[in-house]
From Swiss-Prot:
Membrane-spanning segments: none
Name recorded for this polypeptide: 5-formaminoimidazole-4-carboxamide-1-(beta)-D-ribofuranosyl 5'-monophosphate synthetase
Class of this enzyme: ligase
Gene Ontology MF: a single term: magnesium ion binding
Organism this protein belongs to: Methanococcus maripaludis (strain C5 / ATCC BAA-1333)
Family to which this protein belongs: Belongs to the phosphohexose mutase family.
Catalytic activity: 5-amino-1-(5-phospho-beta-D-ribosyl)imidazole-4-carboxamide + formate + ATP = 5-formamido-1-(5-phospho-D-ribosyl)imidazole-4-carboxamide + ADP + phosphate
Function: Catalyzes the ATP- and formate-dependent formylation of 5-aminoimidazole-4-carboxamide-1-beta-d-ribofuranosyl 5'-monophosphate (AICAR) to 5-formaminoimidazole-4-carboxamide-1-beta-d-ribofuranosyl 5'-monophosphate (FAICAR) in the absence of folates.
Annotated binding of Mg(2+), by residue: Q297, E310
Alphabetized UniProt keyword annotations: ATP-binding, Ligase, Magnesium, Manganese, Metal-binding, Nucleotide-binding, Purine biosynthesis
InterPro entries, sorted: ATP_grasp_subdomain_1, IMP_biosynth_PurP, IMP_biosynth_PurP_C, IMP_biosynth_PurP_N, PreATP-grasp_dom_sf
Biological process (GO), any one: 'de novo' IMP biosynthetic process
Record lineage: Archaea, Methanobacteriati, Methanobacteriota, Methanomada group, Methanococci
Length: 361
């Protein structure tokens, strides 16, 4: 892990009046960049030329850093270009996937918003399960391997893959049949299979809850809630049951979009409770904890219990549903507030208070 002191040494050489907020052109970059501009920051996007159109059309980026391929992000010449523009990187799922988690931890020497040490706790299922479990959250039962399957389960794989390759099954035979099918289609590799995470299939309504922890205020804020459009499952459920049987198609759970929702108000104390518990435990297990945006993906069962099955330790894709604010985020200021602008507000306040070390790593 790059020492915090080294990152802050780099930042100390910056022109603090010309800080540029930078991210990769994908995932949640539109509201990250727009939010930064609304708070008076210069912005830049890292992109390939064929993916630059949205950032030009929407006018969210002041500068463009072009790469031949997104994996070039970690190259030293790109890092130097970022440092030269006094960059603060806001990481999201695509940035981590393209740069590579090992590079983010050990060789990407550009100041980054949030705690880069916690990103591995999202990527590795055992660490994620430890953090969720020790936080005291209700989580699905975990199975040690396919031979332990004794009822409906969901099979998942590590990393920010947007649900690709996930599948439900009920028996060990069904597990291996679906593994073989996905491997034949090139969706899964043998290495993926070795890292398969098998958990209890919880029946309930899905709520992806977006939080922001402010280290400057020491407060967890509820920013918004969304649900996902997933292919092919959301298409299959529109097909009558008898026709589904005839189609004989195994559903996939690839996230293709998101839509905003609100949760019943009587559940909000539970929503804040699980966010507070995760934030507190993260400070113990991976100091300084969950800084800035994070997400808890949950299912609400018919007992009105929130079961948390996954977390994001950085800005989650579902925050795109409230680029102009959510029913919750607007309650803090009385004005529309996106997650991107909330991040920029924290950076701006940290600079004003001389506490920028509290939000960077």
């Amino acid at each position: 892990m790059i020492p915090k002191e080294e990152i802050m040494g780099i930042f100390e050489k910056y022109n603090k009046d010309e800080v540029t907020i930078v991210t990769v052109g994908s995932h949640t970059s539109l509201h990250i960049l727009k939010g930064a501009k609304l708070e008076g920051f210069s912005t830049a996007v890292i992109t390939t030329k064929d993916r630059a159109i949205p950032y030009k059309r929407f006018g969210v980026a002041d500068k463009f850093i072009y790469v031949d391929q997104f994996s070039d992000i970690s190259k030293e010449e790109i890092q130097q270009q970022l440092r030269d523009m006094n960059a603060i990187i806001v990481p999201h799922g695509s940035f981590i996937a393209y740069c590579g988690l090992d590079n983010v931890e050990d060789s990407f020497k550009v100041p980054m918003f949030g705690n880069r040490a916690i990103l591995r706790w999202e990527a590795e299922r055992d660490l994620e399960g430890q953090l969720l479990g020790e936080s005291g959250l209700r989580i699905p039962k975990k199975y040690g391997g396919p031979d332990d399957i004794d009822g409906p389960v969901m099979v998942k794989f590590p990393g920010a893959r947007g649900g690709r390759g996930y599948f439900p099954c009920s028996t060990v035979e069904e597990f291996w049949r679906k593994i073989a099918e996905f491997k034949a289609k090139g969706i899964l590799t043998e290495d993926d299979v070795k890292k398969a995470h098998i958990e209890e299939y919880v029946v309930g309504a899905n709520y992806c809850i977006h939080y922001f922890y402010s280290p400057l205020k020491d407060q967890v804020e509820l920013m918004g809630i969304d649900r996902r459009y997933e292919s092919s499952i959301d298409g299959l459920v529109r097909v009558p049951a008898k026709d589904q049987l005839e189609l004989n198609v195994d559903p996939s759970y690839v996230i293709t979009g998101n839509f905003p929702v609100v949760i019943r108000e009587s559940l909000l104390p539970q929503v804040f409770d699980i966010g507070d518990k995760l934030s507190a435990k993260s400070k113990e297990l991976v100091k300084p904890g969950m800084l800035g945006p994070f997400c808890l993906q949950s299912l609400c069962n018919d007992n009105l219990e929130l079961v948390v099955f996954e977390m994001s330790a950085r800005v989650d894709g579902g925050t795109n549903t409230f680029m102009n604010g959510s029913p919750y985020s607007c309650l803090y200021t009385g004005e529309p507030l996106s997650m991107g602008q909330r991040i920029a507000k924290e950076i701006k306040l940290a600079l004003e208070l001389g506490m920028i070390d509290k939000v960077l790593s």
